[in-house]
C-alpha cells in the first residue's frame, strides 16, 4: 500500500489490486474516506472539512499522476 502524500493528521494512500473505480484512500487516525480519482466523487466515508479541502485540492492537482499510478498498481 503506497502512501502517495502525507499531511498534518492524514495521508493519501492507494492499495494494490483494489476494486474499481480508480480511487484513493484519505486516512487519518479516526477517519477514512475513499475518493474517485477521475471526478473527485466521495465513494464512502467522511473526514473533517479541513482534511477534505486539502485532500480534494491535492487529488485534483495530481489527477494524471494518480491515474498512472492506479494503472501501475492494478
Residue ranges and their predicted role:
Residues 1-3, 72:
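Intrinsically disordered, low-complexity and often Lys/Arg-enriched segments
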Residues 3-7, 26:
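Short acidic-hydrophobic surface loop/beta-edge motif
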Residues 9-13:
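Charge-dense, helix-prone N-terminal extensions
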Residues 14-47:
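A short, structured beta-strand/loop element
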Residues 47-74:
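C-terminal structural segments of small proteins and small subunits
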Amino acid at each position: 500500500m503506497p502512501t502517495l502524500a502525507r499531511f498534518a493528521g492524514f495521508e493519501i494512500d492507494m492499495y494494490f489490486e483494489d476494486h474499481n473505480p480508480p480511487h484513493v484512500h484519505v486516512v487519518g487516525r479516526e477517519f477514512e474516506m475513499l475518493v474517485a480519482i477521475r471526478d473527485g466523487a466521495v465513494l464512502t466515508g467522511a473526514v473533517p472539512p479541513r482534511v477534505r479541502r486539502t485532500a480534494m485540492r491535492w487529488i485534483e492537482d495530481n489527477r494524471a499522476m494518480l491515474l498512472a499510478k492506479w494503472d501501475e498498481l492494478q
